[in-house]
């Protein structure tokens, strides 16, 4: 009270009032605050104050020759006074207006090219649609998101080299442009920027935006692709959201989306093959996404998704150290544990061997639609705080956490036997067995978990076994929060190892990922995915398998033909025939195979019964393990279009139709390619194929030594002669050609000459 009286007293004196209102602020702390450092402390005030002056802008002296002293209205555009402390002229904002209206015109052709990302953004916004605003609580979680739509995926170093090469081509300095994308971009940009007058620095900045992915760790409640992030400030606030549909897509989002789909398809397919790791690598190396090799995309693209990370691990790339379970990404935030094998009994008295984590640990769990914080001890859930989009998502998170806790009451809640298998028909490991069981039905789990009274804590409520909220009681240790749990921000990558069955482990041996964690969600890729590997033929169904198998035979006919005659077993075992087997009815596969192999052997034995079209048509059937039987077939059945269709052993059918006139093969009405040689040389024995590059001189000539087998021919030098054993034990004299150019005619002439030589 005393102080206030004193102040009132002071203020009543007019001198005090005058001192306080009129004197300049010269308090040292305040002066320090506003003058130390180069950083502007109150930018908007500074701007307003500057623009209120007559000449707030400075310009190079040359401007006085380019702009009149006054405009049409007689207002002064620049001052005759020099700017203090520099030899520049002080200029009025009106000069900018004059320059924009009357200044020199330059070519604008380069602007859309340089400021491409901005022009495209305007287009996207122009065509985007904004929907209604909804007021509701926003569960935002911080995620690492791409903030720069329309970029390529070069590393900072690669981009730097490209920019230097494009903007400063004559500067000295080692620049090595190695990757295909670097070379393509450099060539493209150099052409675009010929005679460009925009300042090199600006061009460099804009190129950087175009070439490098920029990520930020931002709170997001909705879509995370870059075309949504660029309008984040328009679509979600603290308590509101606005619906928005982007007015265009950008390649980087499409690449991310298509990469995930390709990786999932490949991991799922590899998991069921004989050697999953080898198959996965073969598929990654032979797949293209939007015309770019998948392995190149994997090296550059930072997308973190289970299947993508398995592919990266297989290629020896580093991945995030978090691990995946039940579709949630777990990151340990504190504590530690040791692992120990333990046998437990389910409610059905089935014995499970589980790896128990002993020790206290805390985790964040992040999924697509729910997030949680989990605190656990050895086989005990201490606390789980969940937040999610809806009841369903929250339930998913709770099930995963309860299974992960390895609590006894969870294991005892199992009703019935656990016998879930993966795509390759192998039993899942016990933890995934439990997970699948409760994902199907968690009623018993939730009922048996136990209930506790709860304290009233801000922002948290309880949840009952039937997933209804409550402020009084909750399932033991479980609470629902309004706030989301942030994704783990650290972008550190670790070295991992991967085993034959695609299980990815960190260096301490903890399993981070396995094929069980790969989502079964199917989507349609935005960019064309081209799987060249035969293992992926079945992705588009039985018809595609049929067409692809025959296309492959025709494309590789030259080598297939030689293998057919010299090493049929190796040919039958080729992986390209694997997918085809699923089309042949299981019960009769072996008989078909035995029948076709016998038929082929007769063709090899009896000269002149060789029929190209027939070999191509029947070859895939010979790939199954053969059963010896006396059965003869006039047609073979394949299961396509939902029913059995017939392939005729002799002649055409809707499934396999060869047009002699055009030499085109159509399979189920789809073009399967053209045969380069004429199969109607019906009798052109396989010898003709094998004897390409050799001239048949006539009957055997003893002077040239004992008869060689067809396989031994390859050792002859050009121009050398030898006797060779063909077909049914006949021997002819041949000479290895000196020139390769005439090889093509050999097939046709060989047949006729063999006949002449033998007769």
UniProtKB/Swiss-Prot annotation:
Transmembrane segments: none annotated. Disulfide bonds: none annotated. It is found in: Virion; Host nucleus; Host mitochondrion. The keyword Flavoprotein does not apply. InterPro entries: Flu_PB2_2nd, Flu_PB2_6th, Flu_PB2_C, Flu_PB2_CAP-bd, Flu_PB2_middle, Flu_PB2_N, INV_PB2, PB2_helical. Pfam families: Flu_PB2_1st, Flu_PB2_2nd, Flu_PB2_3rd, Flu_PB2_4th, Flu_PB2_5th, Flu_PB2_6th, Flu_PB2_7th. GO terms for molecular function: RNA binding; RNA-directed RNA polymerase activity. GO terms for biological process: 7-methylguanosine mRNA capping; cap snatching; DNA-templated transcription; symbiont-mediated suppression of host cytoplasmic pattern recognition receptor signaling pathway via inhibition of MAVS activity; symbiont-mediated suppression of host gene expression; symbiont-mediated suppression of host mRNA transcription via inhibition of RNA polymerase II activity; viral RNA genome replication. The record marks 627 as: Mammalian adaptation. Its main location: virion. The keyword Zinc-finger does not apply. A motif (Nuclear localization signal) lies at residues 736-739. One of its GO terms (cellular component) is virion component. Keywords: Cap snatching, Eukaryotic host gene expression shutoff by virus, Eukaryotic host transcription shutoff by virus, Host gene expression shutoff by virus, Host mitochondrion, Host nucleus, Host-virus interaction, Inhibition of host innate immune response by virus, Inhibition of host MAVS by virus, Inhibition of host RLR pathway by virus, Inhibition of host RNA polymerase II by virus, mRNA capping, mRNA processing, Viral immunoevasion, Viral transcription, Virion. Plays an essential role in transcription initiation and cap-stealing mechanism, in which cellular capped pre-mRNAs are used to generate primers for viral transcription. Recognizes and binds the 7-methylguanosine-containing cap of the target pre-RNA which is subsequently cleaved after 10-13 nucleotides by the viral protein PA. Plays a role in the initiation of the viral genome replication and modulates the activity of the ribonucleoprotein (RNP) complex. Influenza RNA polymerase is composed of three subunits: PB1, PB2 and PA. Interacts (via N-terminus) with PB1 (via C-terminus). Interacts with nucleoprotein NP (via N-terminus). Interacts (via N-terminus) with host MAVS (via N-terminus); this interaction inhibits host innate immune response. Belongs to the influenza viruses PB2 family. This is Polymerase basic protein 2. It comes from Influenza A virus (strain A/USA:Iowa/1943 H1N1).
